[in-house]
Structure formats: structure tokens, C-alpha cells
């Protein structure tokens, strides 16, 4: 990992399998209204975040684009991720959807374009992956990847297209630490990107988490984010509160001990707070 430049110099980056880079911490805007998303992204950029994560299905790409434009930060210092909605899957439709996302964002390219969900139709997501390969070739996206893909899904697209995703974004927190899938990702040199790192807030008052937080003089959220970073993940948190947004970026001035990591790893019980990708067909 290396440090990025400018205001966000303290944020390390990870190199993807296509030699592009991503900051290891980003802000997400899922389930935020337009006004909330715009305020959240503005606050995040001001705090020093440079990785912004949205999706067509969130319905707030235009708001994200407005916040980016208003920030005055050079485009090449910001990393923008958006995602292909399940109804838009398909070889041709995925390319059209990517261009529509660019238009809503008001950008010439995105840094990362992801298939949002497998969606339950193998042939459809394989065709979509072919579309994303064209999206990358055409310069619409610098890097391409997937969200919520299991080991079999990854094997399918890699074996059929001979092109490996740069990123697999998955639900990941101490109750669902995804050790097996992280190992599969690593075997393909795919970066694991963690969403839902705070367990939709339910882990913030977990006794094991709060005890570690007290030991370090940190917030529970900072401990949860730090745990994920130390596992080697890129981590995407979400908040509409500017103070929490700034606090959640302050995760590089301390390190969890091996025992603390083991304690948090030991909380894994398979609990999901988001849909199970193996059966989910929504967007």
C-alpha cells in the first residue's frame, strides 16, 4: 500500500490487478436521498475521502455528481464507483447503462464499474461481464468488478471470459467475516471491498467491540473499520452525519493487536444484514 497525494495524503491505496489503485477507505451513499447523498459526499470530500461509492439502483448518482463538481477537487484525485442494476444486465444493455450512469454523474469516466448483484441468472451476468469488458475497453470505466459474487460466480465468469474482476464488493463485518470468500478473492488477485462494515449499526454497542474501543480511546466504528482494513480490505462506510463521516476516516493512527483481531474474528456467526446474494434477484 502507498499513500495517496493531496488533502487525502494519509489514506493508503491498494493496487488492483489491472494496476489501477483505490484508496482503502471510501464513503457510500446507499439508501440516502438526493439531498442526503449530496451533503454526505460534500462532507466526505471536505474531510479527505477520495473514494465515492454509488449505484444506479440507489437513484442518487446525479446528486453525487453535483457534490463532486462543487468540490473543486481535480477529477483525477477522486475515485468514483457506480454499479450496474440487475434489470439492466445483458451484453448491450450493460454498456448503455454504464453510459447512462456517466451522464447522470456528469463525468467522462468512472474509476470502477461493478455488477451490483449476480441476480440469479448465470448466462445474464456472464453476458453482462462481457459488456463491462467493453465498457473498460471503451474508457467508460478505468476498472471493472463485481459485487456480491460467491466463489462459484467468480469461477464462472473467469473461466468463461478469461477476464478477472479487479474488485469483489461484499457484505463484511465481524459477524460475517467472509474468510473463505476473501481467500477465493485473493486467489484470483481480486481486492475484497467490504460494505456494511458496522453491521448496519448493530455492532456499535457489541461488548467485544466497545471494550477494544475503550482500550484504544477510539469509537466503536473506528475499531470496526480498522479491523477490516487490517484484514486487507478496502472498506466502504456510510453516514449522512458530517462529524461521523470525518471520524470514520480517522482510522490510521492506531493498530489492533493480534489478540484483538482474533477476538473480532471470533464473532463470526454468518449473520447477514443484507440480502443473501445466492438467492436475491432484486436490484
From Swiss-Prot:
Chain positions recorded as NADPH binding sites: 196, 198, 200, 236, 238-240, 244, 247-248, 274
GO terms for MF: aldo-keto reductase (NADPH) activity
Keywords tagged on the record: NADP, Oxidoreductase
InterPro entries, alphabetized: AKR (IPR020471), Aldo/ket_reductase_CS (IPR018170), NADP_OxRdtase_dom (IPR023210), NADP_OxRdtase_dom_sf (IPR036812)
Source domain of life: Bacteria
Annotated CDD domains: AKR_AKR5H1 (cd19134)
PANTHER family registered for this protein in UniProt: 2,5-DIKETO-D-GLUCONIC ACID REDUCTASE, NADP-DEPENDENT OXIDOREDUCTASE DOMAIN-CONTAINING PROTEIN
The protein's name in its UniProt record: Aldo-keto reductase MSMEG_2407/MSMEI_2346
Source organism (scientific name): Mycolicibacterium smegmatis (strain ATCC 700084 / mc(2)155) (Mycobacterium smegmatis)
Amino acid at each position: 500500500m502507498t499513500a495517496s497525494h493531496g488533502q487525502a495524503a494519509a489514506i493508503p491505496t491498494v493496487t488492483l490487478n489491472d494496476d489501477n489503485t483505490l484508496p482503502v477507505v471510501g464513503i457510500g451513499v446507499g439508501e440516502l436521498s438526493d439531498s442526503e447523498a449530496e451533503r454526505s459526499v460534500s462532507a466526505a470530500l471536505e474531510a479527505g475521502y477520495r473514494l465515492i461509492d454509488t449505484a444506479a439502483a440507489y437513484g442518487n448518482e446525479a446528486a453525487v455528481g453535483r457534490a463532486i463538481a462543487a468540490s473543486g477537487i481535480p477529477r483525477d484525485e477522486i475515485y468514483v464507483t457506480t454499479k450496474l442494476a440487475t434489470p439492466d444486465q445483458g451484453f448491450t444493455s450493460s454498456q448503455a447503462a454504464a453510459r447512462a450512469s456517466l451522464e447522470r454523474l456528469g463525468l467522462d469516466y468512472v474509476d470502477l464499474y461493478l455488477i451490483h448483484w449476480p441476480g440469479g441468472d448465470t448466462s445474464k451476468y456472464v453476458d453482462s461481464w462481457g459488456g463491462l469488458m467493453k465498457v473498460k475497453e471503451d474508457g467508460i470505466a478505468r476498472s471493472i468488478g463485481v459485487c456480491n459474487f460467491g466463489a462459484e460466480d467468480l469461477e464462472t465468469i473467469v473461466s468463461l471470459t478469461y477476464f478477472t474482476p479487479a474488485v469483489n464488493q461484499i457484505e463484511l463485518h465481524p459477524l460475517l467475516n467472509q474468510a473463505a470468500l476473501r481467500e477465493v478473492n485473493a486467489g484470483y488477485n481480486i481486492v475484497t471491498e467490504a460494505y456494511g462494515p458496522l453491521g448496519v449499526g448493530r455492532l456499535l454497542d457489541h461488548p467485544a467491540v466497545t471494550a477494544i474501543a475503550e482500550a484504544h480511546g477510539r469509537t466503536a466504528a473506528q475499531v470496526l473499520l480498522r479491523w477490516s482494513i487490517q484484514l486487507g480490505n478496502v472498506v466502504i462506510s456510510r453516514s449522512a452525519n458530517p462529524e461521523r463521516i470525518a471520524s470514520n476516516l480517522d482510522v490510521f493512527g492506531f493498530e489492533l493487536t493480534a489478540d484483538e483481531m482474533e477476538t473480532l474474528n471470533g464473532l463470526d456467526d454468518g449473520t447477514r444484514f443484507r440480502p443473501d446474494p445466492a438467492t436475491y434477484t432484486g436490484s
